[in-house]
Regions:
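Canonical Rossmann dinucleotide-binding motif of NAD(H)/NADP(H)-dependent dehydrogenases/reductases
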Residues: 5-38
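Generic hydrophobic, amphipathic alpha-helix propensity
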Residues: 8, 22, 49-52, 56
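Rossmann-fold scaffold of SDR-type NAD(P)-dependent oxidoreductases
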Residues: 16, 67-68, 90-91
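Amphipathic, non-transmembrane alpha-helical secondary structure
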Residues: 24, 28, 32, 50, ...
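Conserved glycine-rich Rossmann-like NAD(P)H-binding loop of the short-chain dehydrogenase/reductase
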Residues: 35-51
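The beta1-alpha1 cofactor-binding region of Rossmann-like NAD(H)/NADP(H)-dependent oxidoreductases
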Residues: 46, 66-81
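A short helix-to-beta-strand connector/capping loop
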Residues: 56-64, 74
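A glycine-rich helix->loop->beta "capping" turn
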Residues: 59-62, 82-91
Length: 91
């Protein structure tokens, strides 16, 4: 099956560690397949995570970016709450 036959249209995804490397690739691949994608990373100061979010939006998908330390239960709850509010769910 080629990516053109694989559709995630209408789905909502969350990718942790999406600033670079594999996480970035996963986020962009999900968006290319039609999903709206929330991207998170512990480091957002470099602007790389925002750039990933902007690439997703350039594909016509909805995207938000969030600073999240997944070792912090408080941060994880805040992340999930924000994604649920903005996207209405996570598939």
């Amino acid at each position: 099956m080629s990516l053109s036959e694989f559709s995630l249209s209408g789905k909502k995804a969350l990718v942790i560690g999406a600033r670079r490397n594999m996480g970035k690739g996963f986020a962009l691949g999900l968006a290319e397949a039609g999903a709206d994608v929330a991207v998170t990373d512990i480091n957002i100061e470099s602007g790389q995570l925002q750039a990933v979010s902007e690439q997703i939006e350039a594909m016509g998908r909805k995207s938000i970016f969030l600073k999240t330390d997944i070792s912090s239960q408080k941060d994880v709850k805040k992340m999930v709450d924000k994604v649920m509010l903005e996207f209405g769910g996570i598939d």
